[in-house]
Amino acid sequence: MCGIVGAIAGRDVVPVLIEGLKRLEYRGYDSSGIAVLDGTQVRRVRRTGRVAEMAQAAQAEQFGATLGIGHTRWATHGGVTEANAHPHISAGVALVHNGIIENHEEQREKLRALGYTFESQTDTEVIAHLIHHHLADAGDLLSALQRTVKELTGAYALAVMSQAEQERFVCARMGCPLLIGVGEGENFVASDVSAIVQATRQVIFLEEGDTAELRRDGVRVFDASDAAVERPLHLSDVSLASLELGPFRHFMQKEIHEQPRALADTIEAAIDAKGFPASLFGPTADAVLRDIEGVQILACGTSYYAGLTARYWIEAIAGLPCSVEIASEYRYRAAYANPKHLIVTISQSGETLDTMEALKYAKSLGHLHTLSICNVPESAIPRASELVCYTRAGAEIGVASTKAFTTQLAVLFQLTMVLGKLQGRISDSEEADYLEQLRFLPGSVQHALNLEPQIMAWAERFSPKENALFLGRGLHYPIALEGALKLKEISYIHAEAYPAGELKHGPLALVDATMPVVVIAPNDRLLEKVKSNMQEVRARGGELFVFADQDSHFSESDGVHVIRTPRHAGVLSPVIHTIPVQLLAYHTALARGTDVDKPRNLAKSVTVE
């Protein structure tokens, strides 16, 4: 949510800022703006709507500057107006901010008493005025920023410049992601590396409470006590090619089709090892996982559904109790802590605020062992975890998660294998069988992708609908949940998912001739139960759209449409059945003309409550 980019260089930074903001669009936003130091004057342009509209306005201004900051805003405090858009300015101090300041009202009253007036409804303008206020005593911008952040309660990432200081700008981080890009004779700040990858791949990840000063010739970082510190320099593996569409219409479509490669990369270490060593999860994983007596998974959204799927695997295969909770609920309840249970957090970005706070809460309760599953190296959640396993999905730009979800499933399956071996529940021959299933997974996903033309025909039937129902059982109920979420996220069709056995306990009242019902029907031990549930739908006039394995022996009839997925893939079947529900959501949204990659009101990285 929201995005920051800043630059100081020996060249015009306006194109860098604009390009960076365009690459941050996927995070979700409703307005944007830049501020630059043009001579000795701070000049600013802001617009609601797309970055492209703001860029046109900036071009008309004919800015020329070697120092500037930019922002994409997701409205929290105050509506979607130009006055509320960033950057905010206080007498020559310009600032952009991600996050939420919880004590902004208290600070606002103090500032009003000092004679400051406010032009916006935002909490951000409070910070700009505070920095300006402290400049008088502190004497320089960095010291003023360091004094200011000590008065703030909440989460923030900040980039600040002043017309009085033409050779540097400053930044700060607490609870929201922020990194520094290190170039040659130029340096940058950004919410994520995609914003600056066109300029540099060398990055410094700021820690909680850090402040920093950026000049053309160098960077200085200070910790929460204002002591100078050295933070390691990393080489990002994000490439420009991964941020381009190539032959695809949308990033979501591209990322759906990248799943065979992403899965192959994610399982490569296990394939190379010819098994499932604990070292897949870090050098100390064997000692940590050997004594685990249970698993608790904390996640949000799509990652939560990955966790629900893993619960079936962990309990059935590894023989360990497993609970799965929505992170935003867990962090506010009086939870019971068992130090022998492993806390697993799942987050594509590694910066999801509720998941991060849930992890902190679990530790405070006495949980000793933590594992994070994440797609972004060196992000906050992995850094706060004892063990880490990175999915190798690559950059995911579309707001609706696709390849991150299936690679999370692949990692969770490998975790199940490791735990099962350590529990003595998986023999050598069973391990070899599971490894063979995993080896065939990318190919099976490719076969599922080949169903796209058939699914496109279904999408035309779905596009005029306003409601849809998804049904699944057992391992495939979370996939029904994921299918419903994808459809509602990007097509704006109201969709719900239920365990098929719950139909008669309420949802059946919704079924009529106008209600499409999507059924996940693999050829497993619950198939006959699913068929009975389907008969309940047909008896009420509901129209069935069935994703069935090739060996499920379904036939089409009036009101029953069937697409045959690859042969039943055993315990990895949920990964295969994810592909058609992703494609159905994508092509339905396409038929309805929605903004597939940037659906309304949603953000890719949710870094506020």
From Swiss-Prot:
Domain SIS stretches: 284-425, 458-599
Gene Ontology terms for molecular function: carbohydrate derivative binding; glutamine-fructose-6-phosphate transaminase (isomerizing) activity
Which GO BP terms, alphabetically?
A: carbohydrate metabolic process; fructose 6-phosphate metabolic process; protein N-linked glycosylation; UDP-N-acetylglucosamine metabolic process
What the protein does comes down to:
Catalyzes the first step in hexosamine metabolism, converting fructose-6P into glucosamine-6P using glutamine as a nitrogen source.
> Which top class of enzyme applies to this chain?
transferase
CC terms in the record's Gene Ontology section:
cytosol
User: What range(s) does the Glutamine amidotransferase type-2 domain occupy?
Assistant: 2-217
User: Active-site residues?
Assistant: C2 (nucleophile), K604 (for fru-6p isomerization activity)
Major location, coarse class? Answer: cytoplasm
- Species of origin: Xanthomonas campestris pv. campestris (strain ATCC 33913 / DSM 3586 / NCPPB 528 / LMG 568 / P 25)
Q: Which UniProt keywords apply?
A: Aminotransferase, Cytoplasm, Glutamine amidotransferase, Repeat, Transferase
Q: What is the lineage of its organism?
A: Bacteria, Pseudomonadati, Pseudomonadota, Gammaproteobacteria, Lysobacterales
The record's HAMAP family line, in alphabetical order, gives: GlmS
Subunit comment: Homodimer.
Cystine pairings recorded for this chain: none
Q: Where in the cell is it found?
A: Cytoplasm
Listed EC numbers: 2.6.1.16
Name of the protein: Glutamine--fructose-6-phosphate aminotransferase [isomerizing]
Report which gene this protein is encoded by: glmS
Matching Pfam families: GATase_6, SIS
InterPro entries listed in its UniProt record: GATase_2_dom, GFAT, GFAT_N, GlmS/AgaS_SIS, GlmS/FrlB_SIS, Ntn_hydrolases_N, SIS_dom, SIS_dom_sf
Reactions catalysed, semicolon-separated, are:
D-fructose 6-phosphate + L-glutamine = D-glucosamine 6-phosphate + L-glutamate
